[in-house]
Amino acid sequence: MTTTLPRRRGRPPRNSAEPRQDTRALLVRTGVAVLTEKGYSSVGIDEILRLAQVPKGSFYHCFESKEAFGHALIAAYADYFARKLDRWFLDTATPPLQRLRHFIADARQGMQRHGFARGCLVGNLGQEMGALPESFRAQLEAVFADWQARTAACLQDAQRAGEIGAGHDCAALAQFFWIGWEGAVLRAKLQHSAAPLDVYAQGFFQLLK
């Protein structure tokens, strides 16, 4: 005769991996927020743990080192930003150059919302590269290359729509955009003003005429 055990009341037991994943996600979110404001070299693990309210032992369950944590932050920010670019650049109901203007306006509003304290995590790390683990270099370059490719595709749409001349090299324009945009973001943080973003955007669109 088989005996059926009574079903326990309440929620089913959680998988032991779930709390670890929750903690990891919290640490990554906290780290991304901090590193859009401060440099990697100036931020210690203790600051991240204090802000996230996570014990140090839990950090090392999720990441082998601060370097491994840094790689996770770059990957998370790259994924977030790629989705942001796609939201604007793949909006086929909007003319291509207007998509780029919408992205710029959204970024401008984001910087204003945070009092110009936050910038670009990838740009911040790029400026620090001389003091960072060498393993970050290729990852950061790959992120910029991805952003440039998405921007080039939007500019190619603009070219096909006759918004910019056929003689323009869209890949080169996209590279130029990101080199200049990162500088404009840096100046906006420095000046606590959207003026550098506006000056750069105006100059870039003038270049396309």
Describe the function of each predicted region.
Residues 132-138, 144-173:
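Hydrophobic alpha-helical bundle segments that form small-molecule/ligand-binding pockets
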Residues 1-22:
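N-terminal intrinsically disordered/low-complexity leader segments
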Residues 75-81:
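Short, basic, alpha-helical segments at the C-terminal edge of helix-turn-helix-like DNA-binding modules
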Residues 26, 30, 34-68, 72:
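Helix-turn-helix
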Residues 72, 86-118, 170-177:
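Hydrophobic alpha-helical connector segments
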Residues 110-114, 153, 157, 177-194, ...:
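Amphipathic C-terminal alpha-helical segment
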Residues 98-99, 113-135:
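Amphipathic alpha-helical segments used for helix-helix packing
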